[in-house]
C-alpha cells in the first residue's frame, strides 16, 4: 500500500502528526490557510504544503484532520476532504473533544471516518463505531500502532495543548 497522508491543519497537533508520518516514510501533503503554517513546513523537510484541501487530499489514502476543535469546522473539513479524496481514503479526526458519532454523522462516507485519541504514556487509540468495517478497523489499527511506536521514541507535542491549533484555521 502506498502511504500518502494529507494533514489538514498545521497547528501543534497537525505538525506533530505530519512529523510522525514523515518519520514513518510516508509522502505527506498538508493544507492550512493560516500564514503561520509556513513555519511548520520549514521545520519539516519533505512536507509539501498545498493551497487547497482538494490538492492536499487528491492522492491521500490517510487523511488526518487536526483543525481547531469546533464541530462545525471539523464537519465541513471532513465533508470537503471526502468529496475530493479517493473513495478508499480514511479520514482520522484528531480531536479530544467531539464524539465520533457526531463527526461521522456529517460524513459522505461515515464508515471511513474515525477518531484518533491520544492516551497517557504516548499511545494512540482509535475511536470507531459499528459503521467502520472490520478491515478498515484492522488497517487503521496497524497504521496507528506504527505511528504510536514512533511517538514513544521521543518528545511528542501531540499530547501538549497550548491553544496553537485554535490559531491555525
Describe the role of every protein-language-model region:
Residues 1-48, 112-113, 121, 146:
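NAD(P)+-binding Rossmann beta1-loop-alpha1 motif at the extreme N-terminus of oxidoreductases
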Residues 90-156:
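Rossmann-fold dinucleotide-binding core
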Residues 33, 44-90:
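Rossmann-like NAD(P)-binding element
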Residues 163-169:
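Interdomain hinge/lid region at the active-site interface
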Residues 8, 31, 50, 66, ...:
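Structural motif
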Residues 38-41, 81, 103-104:
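Hydrophobic packing residues within well-ordered alpha-helices of enzyme cores
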Residues 4, 12-13, 17-21, 29, ...:
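P-loop/Walker A phosphate-binding loop and immediately adjacent motor/lid segment at beta-alpha junctions
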Residues 12, 36, 72, 98, ...:
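Short alpha-helical
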